[in-house]
Amino acid sequence: MTLQELLTDLEYELQTADGQAVSKDSERGRKLLSREISDITNDSRKAGAGMLFFAIRGANSDGHDYAAQVAEQGAAAILAEHPLVLARDGQDVLQLPAVICVKSTRLGMALISSAFYGHPSRRMKMIGITGTKGKTTTTYLVRSILERAGIDMGLIGTIEAIIGDKVIPAKNTTPESYMIQEYFHEMVEAGCDCVVM
């Protein structure tokens, strides 16, 4: 999937790795936007050739601080909240990641992740459980009731994600949006009609 296809639902400014804004319709802009994106991540340690890296500000770390590392690892693009200068003197900026500047990298990550996985939530019924207490119990009860009614179910919870017969232990109580979209995609591929979370 090209970078341009992933950015369809997003308001953004396109920049080269020297911090310069580029018109999306210019030759340089078209070259940057035509890049194939092989995968997406917000973990700089996992970013590699052809990938799109989400520079997310966290409580303990800021993904923007890892942009140069991600560029050296061959990332095709970086989603950021401010311009990034990654180019050294004499470097061809077209050999470095495209920089996509947005107001919120969290919102951008959610929209891009949905597009990357083919908008899987549009192909299943979604059930969201909210509240203060009893969410996990209610989630498992809803899943059990609907499965007994013959509905193929997926589940994303604070303990685990369940996709068909596959159980994935949770790394965090709330997965990042790109992980949720990946789970949704796997659920669609596994034939799930509905997901409860």
Could you say what each language-model-derived stretch is?
Residues 107-197:
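Phosphate-binding loop of NTP-binding sites
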